[in-house]
Amino acid sequence: GGVPMYLRTLHKLQKAASELGNCEIIVVTQYEEIASKAQESGVRVLINSHPERGISSSMQIGLAAAKESAACLFIVSDQPWLTTETIVNLVHKFQSEHKGMACTLLNDKTGNPCIFSRKYYQELQEITGDKGGKQIINRHPEDVAYLEIEDAKELVDVDTLYNDGRQ
């Protein structure tokens, strides 16, 4: 207890980035507390001043800042059981399979985190509303590297857990 969920995720991401090398972490948030804690952790922070536009607005802010990168990994801050090892393994899977995208997979269902190579940035920029990149993954299944997840708990998204009332 004690450490906010978003900080746990950020620390796992920082650990993964230091293991992988050549990574920049960009936090996109509407929340002042998250912005200041992330800045204290030494990562780049961008404010989403239009969160009402949905997930796509945060994604686009991050993409615009990372447009020179070869690829972007998108992660949500409310998957407390996701491990550093899974993040690192996903990047390795993406690199070794030479596909344009990579994502986690559990029981044939894709999940976060996801990685998109630069060739998909334009398609990602065109998404609107409360949608992420899943539609692009579904549009190009032949160009996706899937990392099979052993422990279902890793992909539990706390928002969904509490919004649905499911376990």
For each of these PLM feature ranges, what is it?
Residues T9, T86, Y120, G132-G133:
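Hydrophobic alpha-helical segments typical of transmembrane helices
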Residues G1-T110, H140-D151:
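Nucleotide and nucleotide-moiety/phosphate-recognizing core
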Residues N112-F116, V156-V158:
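Short glycine- and hydrophobic/aromatic-rich loop-to-beta-strand nucleating segment
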Residues Q122, E126-Q167:
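Conserved alpha/beta core of the MobA/IspD/sugar-nucleotide pyrophosphorylase nucleotidyltransferase superfamily
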Residues Q60-G62, K119-L124:
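Short beta-strand and adjoining strand-loop segment in the mid-core
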